[in-house]
Amino acid sequence: MRLLPLASVTLLSVLCAQAFAAKLEDTAPYPKAEDGFTRQVIHLPKQQHEDRYKVEILAGKTLTVDCNLQRLGGKLLEKNLEGWGYPYYRLDQVSGPISTRMACPDGKTREDFVPVTGDGFVLRYNSKLPIVIYAPKDVEVRYRLWSAADKTENARQE
């Protein structure tokens, strides 16, 4: 029974150490978010062969939509942390939504995540640095990981 408290303390120490190591300020002095913006951070786990992975940034808003395909517009711009050379990203403006114009006979609507589409939303995978994104306060940032298959195919000359 004496091992249980020791195990709990050890587990708590490990979790606290991981949480502390994941703090953005421990990596570099990234600027605070400006008024009207939030600073959102993604810490990626280490992968073997990180060159085979990509990170897709899904910035967007939850909106009321119908049967049509909805999209927002914007560009995710890469900036450089002066003196450090580390990248961070900024989504300055979000336009839209734009929508297809199909008739929706049932007239039903639902709440759904509508992503921003545009340039700069697919990033290189690098677990050594956090992905830091500055986005307008009303924009939610999600992400998806993409990985390449081990097998490659040859192109044919024609």
From Swiss-Prot:
General inhibitor of family S1 serine proteases. It comes from Pseudomonas fluorescens (strain ATCC BAA-477 / NRRL B-23932 / Pf-5). Homodimer. The keyword Secreted does not apply. It is found in: Periplasm. GO terms for cellular component: periplasmic space. Keywords: Disulfide bond, Periplasm, Protease inhibitor, Serine protease inhibitor, Signal. It comes from the Bacteria. InterPro entries: Ecotin_C, Ecotin_sf, Prot_inh_ecotin, Prot_inh_ecotin_gammaproteobac. NCBIfam families: PRK03719.1. Belongs to the protease inhibitor I11 (ecotin) family. This is Ecotin. Residues 1-21 form the signal peptide. Its main location: periplasm. Disulfide bonds join 67-104. It holds the Pfam family Ecotin. The record marks 101-102 as: Reactive bond. The keyword Disulfide bond applies. One of its GO terms (molecular function) is serine-type endopeptidase inhibitor activity. PANTHER family: ECOTIN, PTHR35890.
